[in-house]
Amino acid sequence: MSAATGLFGEHGVGGTSLQMIADAIGVTKAAVYHQFKTKDEIVIAVAQAELARVAAVLDSAVAQPDPMAAREVLLSGMVDLAIARRHLESALTSDPVLNRFFAQHEPFLTLMDRLYLVLLGEDSPDARLSGAMLTAAIGGAVMHPMLQGLDDAALRAQLLRLARRFLGLPG
């Protein structure tokens, strides 16, 4: 799975072949087919693993004693995930295959609705737009070529500062 994730991050889903995945893990293409019948199954498995990471952050946030603490935990976790997954962020946010998958994947849509509700305190078209803008800004920043030399700690501090300002949160 990690080989496919890395290749998707580097080449996009469309630019990654099953042969490339097989070569990366040192097996035959037939061995990959034995585990996953189609490339779509690999895409789904990678996407579900990424969604599980987001869900874990959201669950930690929901466990907080008050909405402000939940927002802070969620925002920090989102930024940390984006920074840790910089290599994959481009595929997650701009790959047409993944975008189509996520747009039709009910668990993703439900997860994002929950995330935006915790982060913004409401479920409305405006909240969805604000949430989408914020997540796109975070994702875009971590993969932006002008910021590749910025160390993770500095990037994290700046992203949190700007995201808090966007959300009207203290700090």
Cite the ranges covered by each PLM segment:
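Short, flexible helix-adjacent loops and helix caps
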Residues: V13, D59, A63-D66, M146-L147, ...
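Hydrophobic/aromatic-rich alpha-helical bundle segments in the mid-to-C-terminal region
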Residues: A69, E89-S94, F101-G171
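Hydrophobic alpha-helical connector segments
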Residues: E41, A45, A56-H87
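Solvent-exposed, amphipathic alpha-helical segments
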Residues: A3-E10, R53-A61, A137-H144
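Helix-turn-helix
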Residues: A3, L7-E41, A45
